[in-house]
């Protein structure tokens, strides 16, 4: 109940509050996040660091709430997709190191003002970072060097390592805090030979980088599936992504579901046999049917191409 004199315009506040009430909600269980975090932590050596991926609004689970919880449970690093995500976390009081996986050249101000640590994957980006730190009078700003060992997205080539070392030794603006790569098929035994090729390439390239720079560089290549299946290669740090949210590549038992999508039924209709339902008449009922309409669609991430699919769980 909202009460007060008319000149306070409480009816406007009431309208705003009503707009905040949705019949479709995604519940996120932070206790499950902590449980999954500890499940993966138990597979690691005590000294192995962990990066947790909270990019893309925490895969829809709420980046700040996740980041705060992970910070409280001594996560070593967080990783976001773009600098703006990291800046928002800083505004909310997140203080642990944050890696920006896809830094844009236009985001340097945001990076430096919020002490966000960029992934550096090309000489163009490396040179731009060096110039910007020199212009600002900054020294030893942490960056994270990415090596492409077979994923073929972003990254330097392994043969670029000598030139990277030469560039880094010739300046004082940035320092390589870590070197890493990304496994392409660690979630399937079908690609194990390729995964081992990637691991071998990275081990060699990372060793060359560290030797050429003559200082300790954090090394990491394992993602969630890699932690489950290739823990022997945990090196100095691992990156926990989809596993944090309860999805296991190898069917690992013990992970807990993090998210629950809840909604209400708007209407129930009787549809005669032979009639179609929905866009493009993709679904036809073979018998007289009773259907329920729920308020979930594009805005909730449910694409129309998922039409005519059966969703089944023990709770359905």
Feature annotation, model-predicted:
Residues 10-11, 88, 108, 189, ...:
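Glycine/Thr-rich phosphate-binding loops of Rossmann-like dinucleotide-binding domains
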Residues 25-27, 32-34, 48-218, 234:
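Active-site-proximal beta-alpha core segment in soluble small-molecule metabolic enzymes
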Residues 5-9, 148-151, 224, 243:
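Short glycine-rich anion-binding loops that position phosphate/pyrophosphate groups of nucleotides
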């Amino acid at each position: 109940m909202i009460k007060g004199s008319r000149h306070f315009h409480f009816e406007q506040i009431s309208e705003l509050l009503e707009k905040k009430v949705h019949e479709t909600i995604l519940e996120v269980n932070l206790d499950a996040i902590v449980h999954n975090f500890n499940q993966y932590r138990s597979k690691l050596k005590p000294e192995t660091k962990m990066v947790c991926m909270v990019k893309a609004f925490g895969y829809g689970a709420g980046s700040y709430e996740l980041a705060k919880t992970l910070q409280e449970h001594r996560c070593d690093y967080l990783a976001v997709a773009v600098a703006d995500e990291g800046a928002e976390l800083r505004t909310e009081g997140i203080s642990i190191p944050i890696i920006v996986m896809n830094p844009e050249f236009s985001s340097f101000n945001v990076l430096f003002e919020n002490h966000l640590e960029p992934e550096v994957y090309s000489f163009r980006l490396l040179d731009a970072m060096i110039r910007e730190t020199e212009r600002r009078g900054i020294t030893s700003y942490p960056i994270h060097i990415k090596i492409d060992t077979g994923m073929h997205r972003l990254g330097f080539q392994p043969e670029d390592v000598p030139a990277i070392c030469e560039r880094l030794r010739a300046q004082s603006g940035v320092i390589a805090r870590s070197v890493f790569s990304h496994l392409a098929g660690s979630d399937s035994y079908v690609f194990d030979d390729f995964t081992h090729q990637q691991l071998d390439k990275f081990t060699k390239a990372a060793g060359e980088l560290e030797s050429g720079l003559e200082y300790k560089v954090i090394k990491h290549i394992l993602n969630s599936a890699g932690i489950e299946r290739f823990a022997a290669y945990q090196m100095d740090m691992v990156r926990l992504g989809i596993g944090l949210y309860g999805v296991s590549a190898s069917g690992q038992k013990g992970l807990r579901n993090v998210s629950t999508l809840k909604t209400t039924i708007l209407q129930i209709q009787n549809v005669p046999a032979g009639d179609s339902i929905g866009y493009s008449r993709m679904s036809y009922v073979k018998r007289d049917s009773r259907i329920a309409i729920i308020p979930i669609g594009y805005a909730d991430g449910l694409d129309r191409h998922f039409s005519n699919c059966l969703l089944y769980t023990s709770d359905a």
